[in-house]
Amino acid sequence: TGPLVCKWGGVQIISPKRTFIGEGVIFDTNYPQDIFIEEGVRLTSGVKIVTHFMNPNTGSYDRGKVHICKGAYLGMNTLVVKPVTIGERAIIGAGSVVTKDIPANEVWAGNPAKFIRKR
């Protein structure tokens, strides 16, 4: 059998018992199905994951998927903005704003998040 997949408010979480979701974590409530969290991810206090924005020119929503890969760590109060993939074992520093894909095994931080070093 494969790993347990749970949907928490529509968010897809692989192996929720091996995933940490801290206090005050907020998932986009309009399109939670666009958020996919793999096993062993740590979302610390205050992390926010957004999968849509309203386009001021059209009034419609621009959507994108957020995929957080196995073993990634997101520091306190990180904001993740669609469409983004955060690679396996990536570390995102506290207070960062992630606006683009983060490769596996890298440390990123800042607003916007920038490469710091390899793990």
Predicted stretch roles:
Residues 100, 117:
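Short helix N-cap motif at coil->helix boundaries in the Bergerat
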Residues 2, 94-95:
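Low-complexity, intrinsically disordered short peptide segments enriched in small/polar/basic residues
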Residues 3-86, 111-112, 119:
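Flexible, glycine/small-residue-enriched loop-and-beta-strand segment within the central core
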Residues 54, 85, 96-97, 103:
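Flexible glycine-rich beta->alpha loop in the catalytic core of nucleotide-sugar glycosyltransferases
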Residues 103-104, 109-112:
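Acidic, glycine-centered active-site loop in nucleotide-sugar glycosyltransferases
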